[in-house]
Amino acid sequence: MLFHVEQVHKPEHCPYGHGGSTSLHDATVAGVRLVAMYGSFMEHVIYLIVEASDVNSLNLFLLPGMKTCTAKITPVSDHPLPIQPSSPVAVEGARLGIDSGSD
């Protein structure tokens, strides 16, 4: 699953000159892959796109930055939304797991 992570730190906790942006995460955690990293450095914000197999692995990945920044984690996808069923009955049946009877 893909996640957009926004890490925000205060200027006094800035990693510039102290390991840099990569010091705020652990890229060696199994089950996690850093897809992309961007910074709005003068705002002290780092944006990550991370693929993680589970939330525990994602938390371990972000652990190095836990005491110096906050992290907003949002699940994201590159898949389009499914087409919405046109019939309310089809929606209700799908929600309840009922077969519509058509093959």
Enumerate the predicted regions with their spans.
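Conserved, structured core segments of small domains
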Residues: M1-D103
